[in-house]
Structure formats: C-alpha cells, structure tokens
C-alpha cells in the first residue's frame, strides 16, 4: 500500500532498516509529499533508543519476518506474556509515563495527569498543602504529554531560585532534559540557530523565571508561540496588577494545558483569588479543574508539631512595645481616609519590625525620620497592604515616607523618642537569647526564619560560634547555591533564612526543625516555612517552633490567629480563606481588635470545579505497581518479534482443555497517529481431546479458523466504536480550547504590539519588529490550524494492525 505521494505506507510495529540499523515503527504521519516516522531501536547497538526520520529523504528497507508463532518454553512464554501485559493500557487515557518514572507511586499524585489525559479540563489548579509533591504532579503531566505527542512543547515558569530545582527534579524523576532559558542562554541559542528562528521554539521543554519573561522584548518573542503545557509555579504571586501578572496572563492564553501550582491560592484577597482562577480562560467558559489535598488526606506519616514558646521580654523591650503601640494606634486613628493608606502601611511595618528585633525597628525608625525630612505631597498615591507581590525581605523607602500625624514636628519628636528606646532594647534582645539557648539544647540541624535581612545579619553575629549559612533575597544565584550546598551536605548546622530566599526549597532530607523568630502578619507564610521540612519523604516528626514575645501583639492577636488558621486548614484544606496583611493590621491596631479574621470556604468563582478522581487514581496506581513488578530486572520488549505459544498443564486436570489467544490491536487516527494500543483476549474450549502433541498444539494455535477471525474483527469494531464514544467529550473540549487560543492570538497581537512599539520618523526598526511579529503570528496560527485538523482526524479512528501476540493451550 502507498500514500498519495507514492510513499510506501508503514504501520505501527513494522520493522525497518534505516541507516544500517533495525528499528520498529511507533508512529507514522503522512503529508502531501513527505512522511514522518518515529521509531524505537531493536538492534544490538540501538536497542530502546528513539529516533525520528523523514521519508523519502531517509531511505529504508522493510524487514519481513515470519508471523508464524514460535513454540516456546513455559519460562519464555511467561516472560513474553508478562512483558506484554505490563505494556498494555486498559484505556486510551491510561498513563504511559508514570511506570517508567523514578518515583514512588502515590495515588493522589496521579489524579491531575489522569484528568488531563481524559480531557476533563484544560486548566488545572493544584492547591495541595506544602510538601505533598506538586512538582511531581506537574512533572507527570509534562512527561505524559511528551510521551503521547513527541513534537509537543512545554514551558515551566518558576521563581528564579527554583529553576535549578525544577531542572534536577525533571532529570532525576522523568529523565527529561529541560534547559534553563535566561538572557545568556537565549542569546547563545539565537546565535546558533540564526535570526529567522525563534530561540524559544528550539527546545521541547524549557524552564525560565517570571522576572525574565516579563521583559517586553521577551514577551514579544513568546506571544507568537502556543505551548502544549504551561506550568506556573507559585502562582499566587501572579495575580496582582503588575508586569509579572501580565506576562503570566499572556502565557496562560497560549497554553493548551495550563497548570497552576500554589499551596496558598487564597491569601485573603477575594479579587486576587478570582484573578488566579481566571488565568487562561480567554473564552470565558473553560472550567478550572482544582485539586486540593491536606496532609491528612495524603496520609502523611508524621503529624507536625508546632509549639509556641512564650518569650519574656526585657523591661526595655516592654517599654519599646508599649510606646510603639501608642504611636501606631495614634497614627491609625488619624489616617482613616483612603488617601492616608501609606501612613497605616508605615506603622504596620514598624510593628512587624519590632516583633522581629529591636535593632530592626531602630533601623526602620532611622529611615523614617530621614524620609519625613522631605515629605512628599499628602495626596500622592500610596501603596496599600501588602506592598510587594513577592514578599521581599527589605521594604522600599516609599513605604516609610508617609506622615502619620497632622503635626509633623510632633511625629518626629515621637519617633526620636522611640528610636532611643529601641536602641536601648537592642542591647539585650530576649528572643535572640532564647534562640541561642534553644539551639544549644536541641543539638541538631535547624532552619531559623525571620522576615527581615537586617535581623538575619544580627542572628549571624549571635551565632558566629556555630556553623551557620545565610539565605536571603540579596544573594546571587551562585551564592545561593553555595549556601544551600553547605547546609544540605552537612557542612553547616544552621540555615538562617528569609521567606524570599527560601521559598519552594526541599530541605526535609537534611533536617526536621524550623524555628520562626517572629510570627509574620501574612499567616500563610508560616505554612510555606514549615513546608521546607514537612514534606513527603520526611523520615522523622517535623517541628515548627514559634517564638512569641509575651505581652505584645504577637501574643494577643497573632498567636491566636495561627492556632485558628491551623484548625480551619485542617478542615477546609488550602483553599480556605485566610486574612491578608491589611486585615491583620486592622485587628492589631484598630480600636476594637477582631478575632473573626478567618472565614470559611473561599468565595464562589464561576467555573471552578473540584474534581474527585480518587477511584481512578487508585486503579491506575495498582496497574502501574503490577506493571513495574512484571518488568523489573528483565530485558527489553523490543526483542519480541514473533508471537509465542506454549502448552501448559495445570496441577488439577480440567475436564475440557482450553485455548487462549491474545491479539494486539493498534488504533490510529486517519493521519496515522497512534491513539491506543489495546489487547483483545479470546478463549475457546477444545472438546473431545485430552492430550496434545507439540505439532498439534502449534497447528491449533497458529491456525485462524473462520470463527476466531470473525471474533477478532468484531472485537476490533467494538474497540473503535467504544473509543470514538469515550473520546468525543475530550475532543470537543480540546477543539474549543484551540479555537480560544487562536482567537486570543489575534486579539492580543494588535494590543500588545501597539503598547510596545513607538514609531519613529527615520527609524525603520519598528516596522521590522511589526513584520517579525506578524510572521510569528502567522506561523502560530498555522500550527493551530494543524492542531484543529489533527483533532478532526481523531474522530475518524481505524484499526492500523491486529496481530496475535501470544497464545496458550491450558489443560
């Protein structure tokens, strides 16, 4: 059989010789004048390797092997049967990549990938608790997509500090190579491939940071690409009104499958939660399939202990906290107007600094006094809480520069007095003393968290006698990697860290103890901190110790908030509403402290669907475990080139001997893309015969009587019909998604170009840029049209091959 272009038609499973080596065809796609074949090596030098060839430019010879079954020993037959069953997929949506992944099979981690392959959605929010393996779940989705579509492309957007961790996890868990694209790598790729090729389109799987992607020139390069999978890690940082959020929205609108990862999806702001849930919903009707598992749901081995240690303040610290509270509440009363939001933000920063350390408070008061010497206009637009999207460990000067009193001279006098009190208290800090005693007693590795970098420097001095390393947002990537290496390899006992420097890290193999020097006013940060050591794989009971200053707002409000937060998250999971900084500040500094800060479930957002795929995941996990046990320590299946038969006798003799035939059926689309490799078993009795010779067994199983032939044809027809019916909802969803992507490409192209290009009278660069963007758009729309055509062809399913794999006579 030949194609329209005169090329020989190849089928799945055909043996060919290309470039002097033997290959088995795994995928054949024909175009007008050429054909692409994906192959797996089955020769002595290329066994189990994968390659792609282009016909007719790569010449090939078809290898014809005998289809006559081979009578084999019981051991050989058992090997072939087990190998065949291990590779079998009970459904077209069964996972293919999970069996070969280097990870323990935990059922709930399979749920998102199962939902993706079944077509339950195109947008996914994985909101599991910290430490439950969201990276593994997203990695499974990527690996599964690349296994099913060898030409698929995926991109992972992660905080800069987590890029190396993502690369190492993908390599270790899934044997996937994912280069980190930054300015240097993009420049070298562009120089290598030429100016006419988009460097972002060269690699199949890439990792980059949101701060790099948000650059205008990078967004221009990415706007003309459609990705099969887009993963947004720490997605709760991408919901505000910022360049980061704009870049995330643009990429989300170009994702066939969008995966949002965050342990803290609802940070207390309903509007930001709604924006998170609307990412990638360009058409307005695409559901957000959500998964949320608490530690109890996941069956974590050890329950975390989180004791509060009440620290008695010194007399100087008590005076400092009392004076600061008086000042802060006075500012709070005098700045009730929205135009004075900056003053409230400033005093909330001072309160948080005081809970961290007296020295940290003194430094901020010094800066505030200096800034109040040059007061900006009172009607200037001021930021509201929280003042950053990423939780930096140093606040900008603009935060501390808003006056809080109507009488500025009076405020400066109050601040000068506070500064002297704070300097006195800094000479003997109770929390630092308590921390030193605690660390000396536990005698094991620990992570000490604080919100502020200057407090971190104070701790470094206090623990100069201990092997300690620092991790904060001001470190370069090599410095950060060196610090982590010292700690994880056991060369440092203490890791002194801020939230910005440590987000997303896996440190559970090194220690089980986290110590919080202060309680952050964003309560979800406590969960993020504990998640560094409280993760799947932790072999001991994790501890998260909170130091609380007695007689301060930490004890009065924040400690109670932390206790209630833990209880409500145990009940409602990570989607529970929690307060943001603004609500916490109102509770601490308002005239009537509020203790109703914690709400119930998150607000209803249209289109958010909580999917329960536990039953399917349990079945899939059992199948994968069995498949692993059947192929462990055995050779490759690529040497199974002929069907095998055997004659087996049972211990208990049966009254009627039986024959079992197992056929392999390959179902493809009209274009030749393999959709499902299924097995069809048939059984028949052998009446009037008690014992069989070898020759009789071979003849009986090799022959294909008319009755068996009709059964095979009927089974194939049922497979095609059932597959078409089960795939129809998924095809409709994928088709609608592709149409939305094409519409978003057209709509955003003109808007983005207009915002980034300023035409010059004598400079033609803008015109060249528009031409380049138009070319990218045309190419992206062409690929989208190809995708729609492939989806249409997927509705026309057919049997590519059906052949006997193994058979047996049982008596």
Feature locations, PLM:
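Basic/aromatic-rich interaction segments and small domains that mediate binding to polyanionic partners
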Residues: 20-56
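SF2 helicase/translocase NTPase motor core
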Residues: 50-82, 88-114, 121-122, 132-139, ...
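C-terminal accessory region of SF2 helicases/translocases
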Residues: 72-80, 540-683, 687-692, 731, ...
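Inter-lobe coupling linker of SF2 helicases/translocases
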Residues: 195-196, 201-202, 206-227, 237-256, ...
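SF2 helicase motor core recognition
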Residues: 215-216, 268-269, 456-457, 481, ...
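A short beta-strand element within the Helicase C-terminal
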Residues: 226, 272-275, 506-518, 543-546
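Conserved Helicase C-terminal RecA-like lobe
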Residues: 304-313, 363-493, 801-811
């Amino acid at each position: 059989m030949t194609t329209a272009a005169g090329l020989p038609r190849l089928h799945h499973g055909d043996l060919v010789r290309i470039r002097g080596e033997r290959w088995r065809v795994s995928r054949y796609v024909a175009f007008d004048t050429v054909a692409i074949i994906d192959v797996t090596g089955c020769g002595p030098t290329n066994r189990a390797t994968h390659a792609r060839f282009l016909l007719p430019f790569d010449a090939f010879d078809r290898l014809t092997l005998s289809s006559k079954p081979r009578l084999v020993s019981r051991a050989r037959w058992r090997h072939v049967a087990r190998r065949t069953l291990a590779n079998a997929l009970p459904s077209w949506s069964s996972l293919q990549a999970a069996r070969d992944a280097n990870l323990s099979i935990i059922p709930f981690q399979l749920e998102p990938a199962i939902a993706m392959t079944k077509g339950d959605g195109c947008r996914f929010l994985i909101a599991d608790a910290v430490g439950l393996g969201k990276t593994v779940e997203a990695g499974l989705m990527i690996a599964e997509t690349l296994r099913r579509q060898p030409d698929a492309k995926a991109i992972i957007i992660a905080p800069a500090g987590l890029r190396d961790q993502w690369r190492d996890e993908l390599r270790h868990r899934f044997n996937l190579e994912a280069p980190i694209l930054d300015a240097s790598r993009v420049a070298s790729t562009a120089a290598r491939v030429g100016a006419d090729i988009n460097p972002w389109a060269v690699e199949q799987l890439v990792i980059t940071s949101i701060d790099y992607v948000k650059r205008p020139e990078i967004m221009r390069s990415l706007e003309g690409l459609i990705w099969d999978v887009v993963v947004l890690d720490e997605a709760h940082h991408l919901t505000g009104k910022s360049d980061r959020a704009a870049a995330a929205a643009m990429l989300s609108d170009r994702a066939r499958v969008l995966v949002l990862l965050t342990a803290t999806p609802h940070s207390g702001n309903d509007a930001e939660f709604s924006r998170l849930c609307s990412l990638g919903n360009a058409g307005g009707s695409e559901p957000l399939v959500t998964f949320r598992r608490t530690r109890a749901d996941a069956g974590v081995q050890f329950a975390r202990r989180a004791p509060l240690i009440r620290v008695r303040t010194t007399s100087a610290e008590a005076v400092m906290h009392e004076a600061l509270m008086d000042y802060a509440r006075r500012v709070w009363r005098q700045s009730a107007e929205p135009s004075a939001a900056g003053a409230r933000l400033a005093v909330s920063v001072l309160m948080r600094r005081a809970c961290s350390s007296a020295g940290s408070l003194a430094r901020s008061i010094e800066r505030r006094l200096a800034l109040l010497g040059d007061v900006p206009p009172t009607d200037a637009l001021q930021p509201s809480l929280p003042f950053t999207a990423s939780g930096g460990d140093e606040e900008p000067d603009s935060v501390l520069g808003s006056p809080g009193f109507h009488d500025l001279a009076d405020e400066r006098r109050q601040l000068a007095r506070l500064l002297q009190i704070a300097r006195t208290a800094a000479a003997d800090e109770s929390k630092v003393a308590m921390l030193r005693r605690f660390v000396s007693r536990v005698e094991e590795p620990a992570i000490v968290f604080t919100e502020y970098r200057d407090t971190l420097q104070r701790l470094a001095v206090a623990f100069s006698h201990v092997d300690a390393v620092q991790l904060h947002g001001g470190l370069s990537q090599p410095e950060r990697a060196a610090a982590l290496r010292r700690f994880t390899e056991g060369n440092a006992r203490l890791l002194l860290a801020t939230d910005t420097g440590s987000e997303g890290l896996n440190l559970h193999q090194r220690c089980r103890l986290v110590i919080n020097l202060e309680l952050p006013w964003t309560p979800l940060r406590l969960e993020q901190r504990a998640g560094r050591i409280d993760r799947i794989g932790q072999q001991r009971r994790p501890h998260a110790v909170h130091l609380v200053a007695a007689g301060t707002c930490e004890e009065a409000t924040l400690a109670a908030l932390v206790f209630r937060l833990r209880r409500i998250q145990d009940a409602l999971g990570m989607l529970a509403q929690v307060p943001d900084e603004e609500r916490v500040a109102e509770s601490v500094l308002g005239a009537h402290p509020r203790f109703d800060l914690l709400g119930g479930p998150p607000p209803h957002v249209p289109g958010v669907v909580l999917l329960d795929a536990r039953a399917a995941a349990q079945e899939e996990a059992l199948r994968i475990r069995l498949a692993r046990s059947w192929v462990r320590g055995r050779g490759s299946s690529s040497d199974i080139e002929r069907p095998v038969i055997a004659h087996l006798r049972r211990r208990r003799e049966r009254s009627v001997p039986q024959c079992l035939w197992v056929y392999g059926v390959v179902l493809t689309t009209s274009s030749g893309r393999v959709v499902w490799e299924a097995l069809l078993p048939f059984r028949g009795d052998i009446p009037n015969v008690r014992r069989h010779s070898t020759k009789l067994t071979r003849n009986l199983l090799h022959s294909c009587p008319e009755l068996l032939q009709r059964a095979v044809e009927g089974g194939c027809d049922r497979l095609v019909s059932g597959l078409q019916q089960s795939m129809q909802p998924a095809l409709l969803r994928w088709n609608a998604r592709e149409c939305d992507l094409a519409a978003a490409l057209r709509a955003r192209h003109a808007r983005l170009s207009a915002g980034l290009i300023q035409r010059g009278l004598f400079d033609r660069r803008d015109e060249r840029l528009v031409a380049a963007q138009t070319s990218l758009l045309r190419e992206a729309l062409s690929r989208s049209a190809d995708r729609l055509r492939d989806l249409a062809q997927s509705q026309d399913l057919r049997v590519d091959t059906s052949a006997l794999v193994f058979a047996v006579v049982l008596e």
